[in-house]
Structures are given as structure tokens and as C-alpha cells.
Amino acid sequence: MRISTYSDLHLEFGSGWMLPPAVNGDVMILAGDIVTLSDYEPLDQILRKWRKPVLYVTGNHEYYTRRPMSEEDNRFKAWLKAKHPHVRLLLDEEVSIGGVNFFGGTMWTDFNRADLRAMETAGSQMNDYRLIYNPDETPFTPADSIALHKNFASRLLNWFGKNLSGPRVVISHNAPVINPNSKYRGGPLTPAFNSLDMVGIIETHQPVLWVYGHTHECDDQTIGQTRIISNQPVYPGLGGVECKDFDEAGLPVEVGV
């Protein structure tokens, strides 16, 4: 199976970015921060040109609408079902396609096991905690992020515990591990997009591939037999492509069955 991957296209900023004709594969992964869920039109233009299976996980920017996340999820699923049934939205869920097993979700951060300083800094500085709302219409908080992270991790481990034939691929928006060359390594907000517990999970369970986004840095590294990649242009309409290693063709990966 040939998999093309993208994240952080940020089409909400009017970049007009479109899939290049050279993109070729069996499955496309969209690992979040593609659009804000108040306007589907930029995404619609891309999905009309790609009729093969798409696996989508939401990022934080999808929810910058000041409406409850659960409400946005339901509206988005209904829109996809009506207009693009070849797209599967994964909300801490699994799906198998062509013998390959996928698990995906946003994977909100656990703030490196509830680092209080990072939680306070993020809560006061990041748009997530002003623009995103919980199902009960209260503002999203770092504590809510930790609770959602625990749900992701629990379901992921349950999936790894299943007796499935075929390779396994994990999709998240937040990073499962810091890029060794990251300019953000050791920064005060690094725990706001990285969770320490995922490294041990990767080392133990060894999925063949983990695809993520969010960091505004491209990545291609391995932990044991697991390849970890991120292919993100980041704000392509605002002064060019931020990640110079961005592959317009989707950084295609072959996953054997």
C-alpha cells in the first residue's frame, strides 16, 4: 500500500494550495490543521480531486470556531458522509483498509505528565484555550487536554492488544516524540505539543508507521522498526512554505501487507 501524508496545510488562511497532479497513492492521510471547521470549502476542493480513501484526524485549528468540539465533530462527519464518503474521520478510532490497520485521533498533549509550569504558560498564551470549547460549552483547558490524551492512550493500547493481522499505522496531530533537531526542543511550551508516554508505547508495540503534524517542522526518523514522519508546509499562503523539507507529493510511504 502506498500512503501519501499531509498535515498543517492551514487552508483557512486562503493559500489556495491544491494537490499537485503527481500525487499518487492508495490512501491519503490528513493529520490535522487542514482547515477550520467553520468553512469546509477549501477542503472540499481538494477532496473532489482525490477519490481514493482518506483518513483524517483533527488538529487544534479545526476547532478554532468557539463552538463545542463535539458539535463540530458531528457536523463534519455529516458533511463528509453526504459529500465525501471516501473520507473517514478518526476520533480515537480504528479502521482497516486493504489489510493495513490504522488507529487515529488528535492525541491532545498530556503536558509531559502534567507539567504545571507548562500548563500555566500554555493556558495563558495559546489560542487553544481561548478559541476551543468543550461539549458543555466551557472553554477548553490544559486539564481537558490531559483527560483527552488519556482517552487516546487507553484506546491506542486496547488496539495494540487486539490480535490483528497486517501492519499497523498510527495517526495523530500532536507529536509522539520530539524531532532530535527541533528548534523547540527543551522550550517552555514543548510539553504543549509532545507527550513523553508515547515513546515507551512505540518502543513496546512497534507500529510500522506513525504520522503526525502540529510542530511546524517536517520529520522523518525511526524508533526501532517504527518510522515516524511529518509532512507539513505550514501557512503556505503567508510568506511561503515554512518547512523547507515539505514534499508536495505527500512524502509517499510504502507499507507492505
Per-range role (PLM):
Residues 10-17, 35-41, 61-71, 94-96, ...:
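Active-site environment of divalent metal-dependent phosphoester hydrolases
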Residues 45, 71-75, 188-196:
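Charged helix-capping and loop-helix junction motifs
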Residues 5-7, 28-33, 55-60, 88-92, ...:
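Active-site neighborhood of phospho(di)ester-bond hydrolases with catalytic His/Asp-centered motifs
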Residues 53-127:
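A basic- and aromatic-enriched beta-loop-alpha substructure that forms the phosphate/nucleotide-
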Residues 1-4, 94-104, 222-227:
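Beta-strand-turn-beta hairpins that frame and shape the catalytic cleft
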Residues 1-72, 134:
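N-terminal active-site segment of His-dependent metallophosphoesterases
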Residues 96, 182, 188-209, 216-257:
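Binuclear metal-dependent phosphoesterase catalytic core
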Residues 103-169, 174-185:
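Active-site-proximal loop/helix segment associated with metal-binding centers of metalloenzymes
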